[in-house]
C-alpha cells in the first residue's frame, strides 16, 4: 500500500479510538449532530522536495515528500464552554498522533511527524461554531518502485 494512503488510514483509526469521539470519518464535511463529537480527516495536499530536482536527481529517484492532512474536530450543539472542549480534543488528537509508533514507522528514519497548528471559528466576528482544524505535516521518502 502507498505510504500516503497508509498514513491517512492510520489517522482515521487514531481519531476513532480517542475517548469522547462518537465518529471518525474521512473526507466528509457533513456530519450530523447525532454523530458528534466527531473528527473528519481530510487528505489535503502533498508536495515534493524541490531541492532533489535542482540537484539533478531523475524523476524516478527517491524523494522526500510532505503531506499535510487536516483533522477537523466537530462538536455537537454549541456547548457553553466550546473553547475548552475543542482544546481538550485537540490535545488528545495531537498527543495520539505524535506518539503513535505506526505513524513514526510509516514516516521512516528520514521522515517526520509534526504538529503544524490549528484553526478555529472562534474569534470576534466569526460564527463561534464548535469546530477546529488540526494540521499535521508528515514527511516521508517516496520511492516510486514501492508504490
Predicted regions and their residues:
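Two-metal-ion RNase H-like nuclease active-site motif
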Residues: 41
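Charged, amphipathic alpha-helical segments and their flanking helix caps
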Residues: 1-36, 45-147
